[in-house]
Amino acid sequence: MSSLASKQGPRYRHTADSSEPYETIGVEKLTPIIGAEISGVDIGKLVSDEARSNRQMDEIHRALAENLVIFFRDQHITPQQHLAFGRKFGELHIHPAAPHEGDDPALMKIYADKDSPRANGEGWHSDVSCDLEPPMGSILYIRQCPPSGGDTLFANMYAAYEALSERMKSYLDGLTALHDGEQIYRGLYANYGVADPPAYPRAEHPVVRTHPVTGKKALYVNNGFTRHIIGIPRDESDAILNYLYKHAENPLFQCRFRWSENAIAFWDNRCAQHRALWDYWPHTRAGTRVTVKGERPV
């Protein structure tokens, strides 16, 4: 894995945003490149108080755009409040495979204990990128944590793209790749009694997408769902994708979030990847996730 360093200094040099100060929330960056903890927000009250909501929501939108993933601690919310918070960002996405909690299929169940055959999201990915219109964001609420471990890592795909050479950027711009959920999802949730549909989503997306809000370019391939680049021989595709996967996993682009009970993470799937660590067996980690619909990548 490259350090992106040279005798002339780092190949990738992050320039911090010169933003105006926030008025209704506190924003403490985890790293200069990705991630921030948000304070001064009570999400339970936010979803029920329109007077409070509008200004804070504007600043939460801004914090997400600037930091790609934001975290809220000590949030004691109900399932209905979790769903309502997600709906403030758009229509909710229904996962094509995962079990849900309660009556609303938009409330995805997140659970792993000593008897689980697997845990959600152990490899680097962008959520459900196999959909024709992949989700724009995911909001994960963890109610129960193991004594240690269970961290989630996030990586900045703007930075991953920007750190590529100009020749590589020129080559990738305009290419598309197939994202397919079949290998990932079929049989994945059999332990919950989930029956597989006849087919899972698959779609072609740009290898480099442009974020609809920020206008920035982001690398949009991931080891979980991307199968091959369209229009080139498979061996070339494999070599390029394997390079891009390793490049995107460089720690320089990452932050690592240590969970506490009743914490929330909200990440932008259009410009960030993530992976969960299952290093806490035989302990339990439990929560729910709400996912917001997105647009077709361009």
Describe every region a protein language model picked out.
Residues 2-264, 269-298:
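Non-heme Fe(II) oxygenase catalytic core, chiefly the N-lobe of the double-stranded beta-helix
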